[in-house]
Amino acid sequence: VDVNRGEIVSILGPNGAGKSTAMKAMLGLLNLKSGSVVIDGKDISKLSPQERVRAGISFVPQTKNVFSGMTVEENLEMGAYLRDDNYQNVIEEIYELFPILREKRNQLVGELSGGQRQQVALGRALMIKPSVLMLDEPTAGVSPIVMDELFDHIIKVKRTNVAILM
């Protein structure tokens, strides 16, 4: 799979075909049997999952992708756990991409709608300023209206020069 910055590439296939498994292998959660994972020309295949995140891969799983008992802002801060710098400016960028999150920043994520929770998950994944964002079935369990809105947000993320694989 080849994904360049500013592109969206979708892996298609029936249930059980290995789409999620492939993403988990790219993130280092599963061992590769062959092939390699390269980001910006650097082979990261031998790196641990944490080192791959530091190298620029961010992943939003299909389920259990937010901390329901934490606020929106606390969820975003969790996405910055590997950052050594002041990440407040990145939180502001996330609020610009997803304005509703600014309004809801002190609200528990468990009280949000499905679409808003997905925005929190996307925002948290963007806190590391990834070069590659992997989304495992980002529209699972959301209504068609929310799905359209979510794709609008994914396109906004693409415009920030992030490669998106879903």
Predicted stretch roles:
Residues 1-166:
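Glycine-rich phosphate-binding loops of nucleotide-dependent enzymes
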